[in-house]
From Swiss-Prot:
Keywords: Ribonucleoprotein, Ribosomal protein, RNA-binding, rRNA-binding. This is Small ribosomal subunit protein uS8. It comes from Trichlorobacter lovleyi (strain ATCC BAA-1151 / DSM 17278 / SZ) (Geobacter lovleyi). GO terms for cellular component: ribonucleoprotein complex; ribosome. Pfam families: Ribosomal_S8 (PF00410).
Length: 132
């Protein structure tokens, strides 16, 4: 059975693993998911990620980050643009998340990037999710 929203599945797996304080979580891999994991690592929300090859699509292993080994760094991770209701923003209307404490992840013509990078480049795109 195919999945309707693989990005929402990735975010839900990360959210659930954070709640039970798992050190790592395995997610079916895709290029978009790897790019989202790369942004999360650059912004310091996860420790690391690794793509493990198998005979199918591969597995994206995400190593979660905790403060003092008990509190997760990611407080909230929310999907914004969904398959049934896409959300697009231009560079002037990219939202500020939690007064600048969080980030928005956008899919732009230049690739997947944070809200700050998109504002600096002057481009908009699809608002994938917010993290803080």
């Amino acid at each position: 059975m195919s999945m309707t929203d693989p990005i929402a599945d990735m975010l839900t797996r990360i959210r659930n693993a954070n709640m039970v304080k798992l050190q790592k979580v395995d997610i079916p891999s895709s290029n978009v998911k790897v790019n989202i994991a790369q942004v999360l690592k650059q912004e310091g929300y996860i420790k690391n990620y690794k793509v493990i090859a198998d005979n199918r699509q591969g597995v994206l292993r995400v190593y979660l980050k905790f403060i003092d080994e008990k509190d997760p760094v990611i407080n909230e991770i929310t999907r914004i643009s969904k398959p049934g209701s896409r959300t697009y923003v231009d560079s002037e209307s990219i939202p500020t998340i939690k007064n600048g404490l969080g980030i928005a992840i956008l899919s732009t013509s230049k690739g997947i990037m944070t809200d700050a990078s998109a504002r600096q480049a002057g481009i908009g795109g699809e608002l994938l999710c917010t993290v803080w």
